[in-house]
């Protein structure tokens, strides 16, 4: 399983890698790399919306245009309820406000993996 992480923060990469290293391949890109569209296909996408990401919906649109509309996206976003709603409405599967609670973050990742498995087995591509 390939997980594509877009984050400008090394700490987010390290936490995500610690969670997923035994059962997936984590591929880390910076948020600016979304513009280039030169990243590999993946089973799951995680996007870290830090304060530098101005247009909250554009990264999801760009990632899904490259990896596919059915690939689930987990958003790391500590924004207003309106920003979080917008991210979910545009196509994020779920969100988490911080990666500091490692157990909650692990649960979100495991949940999105289960959803992806279920979608592939019973849904449509």
Where do the protein language model's features map onto the residues?
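C-terminal output helix
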Residues: 100-109
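Two-component/phosphorelay signaling modules centered on CheY-like receiver
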Residues: 7-32
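Alpha4-beta5-alpha5 "output face"
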Residues: 85-89
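CheY-like receiver
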Residues: 115-125
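Conserved phosphotransfer microenvironments
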Residues: 33-70, 77-80
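A structural signal for hydrophobic residues in beta-strands of small regulatory alpha/beta folds
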Residues: 96-97
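Extreme N-terminal starter segment of soluble prokaryotic enzymes
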Residues: 1-3
